[in-house]
UniProtKB/Swiss-Prot annotation:
SUPFAM superfamilies: ARM repeat (SSF48371), E set domains (SSF81296), Protein kinase-like (PK-like) (SSF56112), Ubiquitin-like (SSF54236). Residues 1055-1073 have a biased composition (Polar residues). One of its GO terms (biological process) is signal transduction. This is Probable serine/threonine-protein kinase DDB_G0268876. One of its GO terms (cellular component) is cytoplasm.
Length: 1385
């Protein structure tokens, strides 16, 4: 396609004009010039050609255009007419009415005139050139001669600077491809000029142009064939010879540096074209264009039309190497982009490449508009990582500092926004932002009075604060300025960002020290505030309490919505409080200054942390609790003292009930640290608090938090009223830690008894580690086991284990340690003395016959005691008759816990007495379980029946080999009951999994006892003891009275120094008789052998039938009471001989009820307020009722925890089996959780804790659970009126006194009542026994429910949900067969 252009000088007017020769020019003549263009060419190419054609701007010309398009001439003409008319519609241009566009059909017309380059001299050389009329080939050749003769021409084709684009060269090559024709060579002369436009003679030897065809499949036709002559005089000659038509891309490089940022896409057309001899652009043309652009930019009405001229050309001129032209065009461009729409168009059309080109210029920063453009562009592109990476690598950070110091506010604001975004989204780029120049810029930006700029600057500092240190002077200067600005700023939003920075600074020890020395503490806790109240904007706790009581339908949805709205309103305030608390906690961690710890342990610092505790935001509370944990771990003991004296313990404990999982570790560790400093600081904790710790202990038993919880409970266990609750609730996990603490010397649970207070009479035994002596302590019969540390058989580890277990366990069938001493050189244990000695003494003495009924009674008590141990995860590991002590009433007490340990994954090999060792223990296995004690129990039962020593006829090495290889067992006597035979057989089976649990054994023996009772072998005597009469195995004939009936003779809480009782009841320590048969001996390296004195052998009077008042179950046993100061409720089972109103201390004051505030916070689920535990911040006092559940107490292990707190007088004790049917278990307590049935768990299968846990849940302390707290620390005068008065109701102590009066008024009446109760219970047992067996066939165990379910209904109604789950024992196939056989019998 060719455009026919007819141009007339603007100087000519009218219908015609004279030329320089006076000839009139006829517009209809052939004075026309042809311009060949292609439809794909953009408008800027047409404009550039027009300028090149006529050497002067078209404003001075009349233009007549004819478009020749053989395919679609009309539409093509219309399109070009529109483009050119829009180009010429400028007020400075004269639009002539005679301007026309005509369509001319030229068939195969070949133009005879061709364009030649202008003269390479001055801009006025056009006047010397002939007019463009009647141009022909000859005139073209004449022009070549003229040009060749004009030396020193100034031409510009290509910039000499590497890396710059050259639009002229791109256009030249592209136009050459347009004109190219197959078989015709197209030549381009390439000139190189300097920045002044002067010709460079020495052309680079590494000039490369590649023309590649796009989307070509064939390799041969991808690259266009052309020849390239590298060097010829003052130019380089490129010869192109197109072969295949299509789209090509151009790549132009000089010294391997691309000069064309974007390849020029073009299409070759098949059209004849003669050789183009020369193509170049002159400097005169550039000057004329600048003149035209300047003319257009001078008037506001025409400056927008510069886009009509083409922004591409304008931008090309901006990068022209002539500095004068460059500065001029940059100024015009800056004026052009004052309007935002023009900025958008530039960035939209040219993208981020334009920014990089612009900042590469030398003088762009002199123009404010360009600064604004770059600043706004940086703000827009700050989230685009590719741009950021390229910007920092190619441009650098100094541009930011340059723009930020501009006078126009938009520039520093945009820079602040840019820095804040970059510091937030790209941590990798922070290395560029921590330079000294940026920090100086940040300091400058902080001084600007613009909120957006300051906020973004503070945000940048907070994001970069983790990268700061004191090694650079700029960091110190920035911190100093930040501290000064913090004093001036009052807006919460600014304080949020400042303290966010401070919180990060305080992580670094040097920065933290600098901030402290420069007054940050005065910003956190003002010294002038003497009231301790801080105006911290927090949505505090009482806000939520108020809404709970105001809203009538305070359902969960309303409360959550309320909290959500408050969070939105106080978002900035909440953030401020959080970063303030984070700054304090980080400061406490980083600094080694004890002064800082002391600052926040008292005074305003402590008051501030207390306020954080009651903040609604979880993160704030967490940081406050973290601060308390750090202070409590400070080497400065004064800090811990201040915390305790300030009453922080109640706040921490009460917060546990509402704390989230992230807060709990800080609270627990704080309490543990304070306990290490002062063990008495947690003495005021109540039952609810202890239950909460036990719940946390088992929530995640594998966490490190369990050790801290156990440490706290270990200090509380020294209180007799909590001991049984903690042991039963904590289970084996707690006992493991407790024993570890004792062994390490961190805790001592052994109550110290001075040796001067002991009256030792005679030696009753001697062993390899010490002696056992009988004596008295405050008038009570005791046995003292003295250890000789120099003996080889002594083991301090075993001493601590035995002392700990015997001190903390509370059960009617477990020997209790009253106290003793663990001091080196004076190590002894003081225990109850039992006059009948050990079961081994009874068996070997052959003085008192052991009837079947008595054996059932003894075996049942051993099983119950062992079941209690197993429920706590304890393996005795040395169960034998020598370790089973018998009191005057034939009650069994298990002793000698030196070898006992809590179940672990790995156990000690071969521990215990060999003949009682289980098969797996003899094999040396370390993974044996509690079933090893069941194996030992079988031999205890066998020894009671046979009254012989196991394997007495064999050497030890012989019978061990027979046991391991041939499963040999001692022969069971023929006179043995079938029930005993079957039980022994199952208990000593080689496979531990086939052995029953002690809970199953208890059930079995209970049913056997009932069967004997139905057959007349057993009867209940008036004294409340079950003995055998007549027929098989008579235990003894009761006289109907209970002349020698024994209760505990040592009461911990009632001994006052007077001894009014000379009871014949004695207490006994572990007596391991020495026997020449080694089968009775334990392993030498681990077991103590105690030699019993001949003077202390049992006599016939000891086995007198008249003194036999044996109970049918441990729940009716008379347990000896513990001495004064013991930590065990041994005397809880009955009234002490000296327990009366005169000896018992009375309380003439009332315990005040706790004033507490409920904590319902928006970031936590809203619990049911009625069922929620009272926390430390309840604003309505709710009395805590103490329910007397003694009449419904059915625990076989815990019978009334403490006489001082429970009424024991008329307790009806019933036997209750914890292995119940689903219906019965549902009746026990609502909400009982399922148990973890692991064998090594303290809630393991077969070791149900129903009795213990029901006792734990029923027993309630007489003191209010928790603490009596002061009002919240914020504005005490305001909240003082909200504290309710103390409730003046009678305390549980009064009831206890009354109960004790009843206990001591008439013992005979009590005995009669007990007789009646027992008779009634046994009648019920007889009625229900068969039903119990039939209802539990699926369990394979005969279970006796007795009256326990009915008796416990009231107890369940008065007791909260059971905290510790009841585990169901496993079904045993061998037991099922045994039960079937038992039913048939």
């Amino acid at each position: 396609m060719r455009v026919l252009v007819h141009v007339n000088n603007a100087k000519q007017s009218g219908d015609g004009a004279n030329n320089s020769n006076g000839t009139l020019i006829n517009y209809n003549s052939n004075n026309k010039l042809f311009l060949e263009i292609h439809p794909n060419q953009s408008i800027w190419m047409i404009k550039t050609l027009l300028f090149n054609l006529f050497q002067i701007p078209p404003a001075r010309q009349q233009l007549y255009l004819k478009v020749v398009d053989e395919i679609n001439p009309r539409e093509t003409s219309k399109a070009y007419s529109k483009l050119l008319q829009s180009y010429r519609l400028v007020k400075d241009y004269k639009i002539y009415e005679g301007t026309e566009l005509q369509m001319v059909a030229l068939e195969k017309e070949i133009p005879s005139e061709f364009l030649v380059p202008p003269k390479k001299t001055q801009s006025n050389s056009m006047e010397k050139l002939p007019h463009f009329t009647n141009l022909s080939m000859s005139s073209m050749s004449n022009m070549d001669e003229i040009l060749s003769g004009s030396g020193g021409g100034r031409i510009h084709v290509l910039s000499s600077k590497k890396g710059e684009e050259c639009p002229a060269l791109c256009f030249a090559v592209g136009k050459g491809l347009y004109r190219g024709i197959s078989g015709v060579i197209y030549e381009i002369k390439l000139y190189r000029v300097d920045s002044k436009g002067m010709l460079i003679v020495n052309t680079s030897l590494n000039f490369q142009i590649d023309v590649i065809k796009k989307d070509s499949i064939s390799v041969e036709d991808r690259k266009m064939a052309f020849t390239y002559e590298q060097r010829k005089s003052d130019y380089s000659l490129l010869k192109l010879q197109p072969i295949i038509y299509g789209e090509y891309s151009i790549s132009i490089k000089i010294d391997d540096t691309p000069i064309c940022g974007s390849p020029f896409h073009c299409t070759i057309i098949d059209e004849l074209n003669p050789n183009l001899k020369e193509l170049a652009f002159s400097n005169e043309w550039i000057e004329e264009v600048v003149q035209l652009i300047t003319l257009m930019s001078n008037k506001p009405s025409t400056i927008d039309k510069l886009f009509s001229f083409g922004i591409e050309g304008l931008m090309n001129l901006m990068f022209y190497p002539d500095p004068t032209i460059q500065i001029h065009i940059i100024g015009i461009f800056a004026k052009l982009i004052e309007k935002d729409k023009n900025k958008e168009r530039v960035l939209k059309e040219f993208g981020m490449d334009f920014i990089f080109k612009l900042v590469s210029l030398d003088n762009w920063s002199n123009f404010m508009e360009l600064r604004k453009l770059v600043a706004s562009s940086l703000c827009i592109l700050s989230c685009y990582k590719p741009f950021l990476n390229r910007f920092f690598k190619e441009v650098g950070i100094d541009v930011i500092s340059l723009i930020a110091r501009s006078d126009f506010i938009d520039c520093p604001r945009s820079c602040a926004i840019f820095l804040s975004r970059v510091s937030e989204i790209s941590f990798e780029l922070n290395e560029y932002l921590i330079s000294d120049s940026i920090k100086e810029t940040l300091i400058y930006l902080l001084s600007i009075q613009d909120n957006i700029t300051v906020n973004c600057t503070l945000k940048t500092i907070s994001n970069l604060s983790s990268s700061f240190d004191l090694k650079k002077e700029s960091n110190i200067k920035l911190l100093s300025n930040l501290l000064e600005y913090c004093k001036e700023f009052q807006e919460i939003s600014k304080k949020v960002l400042i303290f966010k920075s401070f919180s990060n600074f305080c992580v670094n020890e040097s920065l933290c020290t600098f901030l402290i020395s420069n007054g940050i503490l005065d910003l956190i806790t003002p010294t002038h505030d003497k009231s301790g109240y801080f105006g911290i904007p927090m949505f505090c706790q009482w806000e939520s309490n108020t809404i709970n009581y105001i809203i009538s339908n305070n359902n969960e949805i309303n409360l959550k919505q309320y909290g959500y709205e408050f969070n939105q309103i106080f978002k900035e305030e909440t953030d401020y409080v959080f970063f303030l608390s984070l700054t304090i906690s980080n400061m406490l961690v980083s600094t080694t200054s004890l002064k800082i710890h002391d600052h926040f342990s008292r005074g305003n610092g402590l008051n501030l942390l207390k306020q954080f505790i009651i903040c609604h935001e979880c993160s704030v509370r967490s940081e406050a609790f973290r601060s308390f944990m750090i202070i409590s771990n400070s080497p400065n003991d004064q800090c811990k003292k201040h915390l305790i004296q300030s009453g922080i313990i109640p706040y921490l404990v009460s917060s546990l009930f509402d704390s989230l999982s992230v807060e709990t570790p800080f609270i627990v560790n704080t309490l543990a640290n304070l306990c290490k400093y002062d063990p008495t600081c947690v003495e005021n904790m109540g039952v609810d608090d202890i239950d909460k710790f036990i719940e946390l202990l088992h929530r995640d038993s594998t966490s490190s938090l369990s050790k801290s919880i156990s440490y706290i409970l270990s200090h509380l266990i020294r209180h007799d009223k909590y001991k049984q609750r903690i042991v039963n609730g904590g289970g084996k996990l707690f006992l493991q830690y407790l024993i570890e603490f004792v062994r390490q010397g961190e805790i001592s649970v052994l109550k110290y008894i001075s040796q001067s207070d002991l009256e030792l009479t005679k030696e009753i035994g001697r062993g390899v580690s010490g002696v056992v002596k009988r004596g008295k302590w405050k008038g009570y019969e005791i046995a003292v086991k003295q250890f000789n540390e120099e003996e080889l058989g002594f083991s301090e580890r075993e001493f601590h284990s035995e002392a700990t277990i015997m001190s903390v366990l509370r059960h009617d069938n477990i020997v209790h340690c009253v106290g003793g001493s663990a001091q080196p050189g004076k190590m002894y244990l003081v225990c109850d003395y039992y006059s009948r000695g050990s079961l081994y003494s009874v068996i070997t003495a052959n003085i008192c016959p052991l009837s079947n009924a008595r054996i059932v009674h003894l075996a049942l008590q051993v099983a119950k005691g062992m079941n209690y141990l197993h429920s706590l995860g304890i393996i005795h590991r040395d169960l034998k008759p020598g370790n089973l002590l018998i009191d005057q009433d034939w009650n069994i007490r298990i002793s000698d816990f030196g070898l006992s340990r809590v179940v672990d994954n790995r156990m000690t090999k071969t521990v215990g007495t060999p003949c009682y060792m289980a098969v797996e223990v003899l094999k040396g296995l370390t993974d044996y379980s509690q079933q090893a004690d069941v194996y030992s129990f079988a031999f205890v039962l066998w020894e009671c029946i046979s009254r012989q020593i196991p394997y007495k006829d064999f050497a030890q090495i012989q019978w061990i080999s027979m046991v391991l290889e041939d499963s040999f067992r001692p022969p069971i006597p023929d006179s043995c009951l079938p029930e005993f035979r079957d039980l022994i057989t199952m208990c000593w089976t080689s496979n531990p999994d086939d052995r029953p649990s002690f809970q199953q054994i208890i059930t079995y023996l209970e049913n056997l006892r009932l069967k004997m009772q139905d057959q007349g072998i057993y009867q209940i005597l008036t004294g409340g003891s079950s003995v055998g009469i007549g027929g098989v195995g008579v235990v003894g004939v009761g006289s109907g009275g209970n002349s020698d009936e024994h209760e505990s003779n040592i009461d911990i809480d009632t001994v006052s120094g007077s001894n009014n009782n000379e009871s014949s009841t004695a207490v006994s320590l572990n007596e391991n008789k020495i026997n020449i048969d080694m089968s009775m001996h334990p392993t030498e390296e681990l077991k103590n052998l105690v030699e019993v004195s001949k003077d202390d052998n049992p006599t016939n009077s000891d086995y007198d039938i008249r003194s036999s008042s044996t109970s049918s179950s441990p729940s009716t046993l008379s347990a000896p009471q513990s001495p004064v100061g013991s930590t065990s409720p041994m005397g809880s089972t009955s009234t002490s001989p000296i327990s009366n109103n005169n000896n018992r201390p009375t309380h003439d004051h009332q315990q005040p009820h706790q004033v507490k505030w409920e904590r319902i916070v928006p970031d936590k689920p809203n619990p049911n307020l009625k069922s929620k535990r009272l926390s430390a911040f309840r604003n309505k006092a709710v009395p805590i009722s103490i329910t007397d559940n003694n009449n419904n107490n059915n625990s076989a292990n815990n019978n009334n925890n403490n006489n001082s707190m429970k009424n024991n007088s008329n307790a009806s004790r019933n036997t209750f089996s914890s292995v119940s049917s689903p219906s019965s278990s549902a009746d026990l307590s609502s909400g009982i959780e399922s148990s973890n049935n692991r064998d090594d768990s303290f809630l393991s299968s077969g070791s149900s804790l129903s009795e213990q846990h029901r006792s734990v849940s029923n027993s309630v302390s007489n003191s209010v659970g928790g603490f009596s707290l002061p009002p919240p620390p914020l504005a005490p005068s305001f909240y003082a009126s909200m504290i309710n008065e103390k409730i003046s109701s009678s305390t549980p102590t009064d009831n206890n006194n009354n109960n004790n009066n009843n206990n001591n008024n008439n013992n005979n009446n009590n005995n009669n009542n007990n007789n009646n109760n027992n008779n009634n219970n046994n009648n019920n047992n007889n009625n229900n026994s068969n039903n119990s067996i039939n209802n539990n066939n699926n369990n394979g165990i005969a279970i006796n429910y007795t009256n326990s379910i009915n008796n416990n209904k009231n107890s369940n109604n008065n007791t909260s949900n059971t905290k510790y789950p009841i585990s169901k024992c496993k079904s045993n196939p061998s037991f099922e067969a045994l039960k079937s056989k038992f039913d048939k019998d």
